[in-house]
Amino acid sequence: MRDSLARNILLPTAPSLGAIACLLLAIAIGLLLLPRSQPHCFPPGPPVKPIVGSILQVSPQGAWYKFSEYQKVYGDLLFFRGLGSHVLVLNSMKAINDLLDKRSSVYSNRPTFTVVGELMGLGQSMPLLPYGEEWRAHRRLAHSALSPTAVRRYHGIQEDMAALLCMRLLREPEAFFSHVRLIAGNIILSVVYGLPVETSEDEYIAHAERTMQVIGKATVPGAYLCDLMPFLKHLPSWVPFQREASTGREMIERLVTKPFEHVKRAMEAGSAPPSVTQDLLSTNIDDMHDVEQRIKWTTGAMYGAGGETTYSTVLVFIMAMALHPEKQQRAQQEIDRVIGIERFPRISDRAHLPYVNAVIKETMRWHPVLPLSIARMSAQDDLYDGYSIPEGTVVIPNIWGIANDCPRATEFDPERFLNEGAPVDPSSWAFGFGKRLCPGKFLGENSVFILITALLAIFDITPNSSEDLQPDFTLDLVSYPRPFKCRIQPRSEGHAQLAISRAAQRSF
């Protein structure tokens, strides 16, 4: 009885077999009559391996070099996939403009950086906030404080800091890494919080440097396996990346909170000097409950990112001048002709120094300090140039590849920006794209200009005779020269006295 019942349940009868066959035939005919959809046609990329795909074929450290090699094989669009993720690398300015600028509504989001964003807490900061209302609120605050008109009030601070840099280099030229770090950080601290400091060992400068090193390593896409497999964030606290994340969270919270609270206390005491934070807190005082946290994180983003890129760019410039004294001499001749040797450079001189501006552009092109910018993420499925780009694809602009897409790319040649057929101006890619364009662009450009122009005006930068200087750069999110030696000497006693005199006039 039981066996008979089992056979009746498990084995179809002849009529039921016929019904099933008819059903399958009907389905097959229906499928043949349906319009055929094309399979996903992803952009080209390295061969896909079982399970992991191609996503792990490039090390996060210095990935821009490998991306540029792959461009020669696969072209301007480079696609990786695996472990449930898709990554699209943009290797041309056209592709970047088409997607990040013209389709900014689709490509203005950020990927979820599980470690640095969620576990370390940096996801509250404007650079990593998802595209939406909260991000727009942060953006409005930053724009109001850093518009082209607003940053003019900080010209004096930036010029004072340039003079202070020169004075410190006169006293201790071999410590130029430390001096540039101090001055780049000091500009940001003074502008954002009204907090000038005296040494590079100051707790604000030193802590910002350590914190930005942590952020720089963690913000490179794929730096942690947890970024590719977010469920790993639930692993216990003793796992190494969890310990790193916990330390990073404490460092980031201190970075954004301590100077902010300093300004609040100074405002309560009536002793707060002018600053971005003071302005924003004063302007939004009637709505403080809603915006104080936003102001803290908006100004914290300025503090963390602003000094780092200025520091890196000036170090690249010093290296380039030590390697190319003939370019330095031509820039000095222009400064002597336009400004003379009776006064210190000013930001207002910028429009009258075309060759100096070309030197700055070439510095930015020769080694971009943000070689991969900061990754984006597609908000929906998209089609570009005949290729499918799935929703949630991480999109990386290969800035280093674009900067090197010109004749004699390894040569330092400012003249290329003064001739016909000049490369794309680095300012069009150095500060981001579309709706994610860095609001600190104008402040940053002014800082780089006045620091570089002051160094050209006052000093001769030459190689160290005991060391063969070879360009060598770090491989993190922000890339700058590894420690190197060079000689930084005043052009004359008169130039040295000019720097000392101007530094004595500073307002702090």
Swiss-Prot record:
<keyword id="KW-0560">Oxidoreductase</keyword>
<dbReference type="GO" id="GO:0016705">
    <property type="term" value="F:oxidoreductase activity, acting on paired donors, with incorporation or reduction of molecular oxygen"/>
</dbReference>
<keyword id="KW-0812">Transmembrane</keyword>
<dbReference type="InterPro" id="IPR050364">
    <property type="entry name" value="Cytochrome_P450_fung"/>
</dbReference>
<dbReference type="GO" id="GO:0020037">
    <property type="term" value="F:heme binding"/>
</dbReference>
<dbReference type="GO" id="GO:0016020">
    <property type="term" value="C:membrane"/>
</dbReference>
<keyword id="KW-0479">Metal-binding</keyword>
<keyword id="KW-0349">Heme</keyword>
<protein>
    <recommendedName>
        <fullName>Cytochrome P450 monooxygenase 74</fullName>
        <ecNumber>1.-.-.-</ecNumber>
    </recommendedName>
</protein>
<dbReference type="GO" id="GO:0005506">
    <property type="term" value="F:iron ion binding"/>
</dbReference>
<keyword id="KW-0408">Iron</keyword>
<dbReference type="InterPro" id="IPR002401">
    <property type="entry name" value="Cyt_P450_E_grp-I"/>
</dbReference>
<dbReference type="InterPro" id="IPR036396">
    <property type="entry name" value="Cyt_P450_sf"/>
</dbReference>
<dbReference type="InterPro" id="IPR017972">
    <property type="entry name" value="Cyt_P450_CS"/>
</dbReference>
<comment type="function">
    <text>Cytochrome P450 monooxygenase that is able to use 3,5-dimethoxy-trans-stilbene and 3,5,4'-trimethoxy-trans-stilbene as substrates for oxidation.</text>
</comment>
<comment type="pathway">
    <text>Secondary metabolite biosynthesis.</text>
</comment>
<feature type="glycosylation site" description="N-linked (GlcNAc...) asparagine">
    <location>
        <position position="464"/>
    </location>
</feature>
<dbReference type="InterPro" id="IPR001128">
    <property type="entry name" value="Cyt_P450"/>
</dbReference>
<dbReference type="Pfam" id="PF00067">
    <property type="entry name" value="p450"/>
</dbReference>
<feature type="transmembrane region" description="Helical">
    <location>
        <begin position="14"/>
        <end position="34"/>
    </location>
</feature>
<keyword id="KW-0503">Monooxygenase</keyword>
<dbReference type="GO" id="GO:0004497">
    <property type="term" value="F:monooxygenase activity"/>
</dbReference>
<keyword id="KW-0325">Glycoprotein</keyword>
<comment type="similarity">
    <text>Belongs to the cytochrome P450 family.</text>
</comment>
<keyword id="KW-0472">Membrane</keyword>
<keyword id="KW-1133">Transmembrane helix</keyword>
<feature type="binding site" description="axial binding residue">
    <location>
        <position position="438"/>
    </location>
    <ligand>
        <name>heme</name>
    </ligand>
</feature>
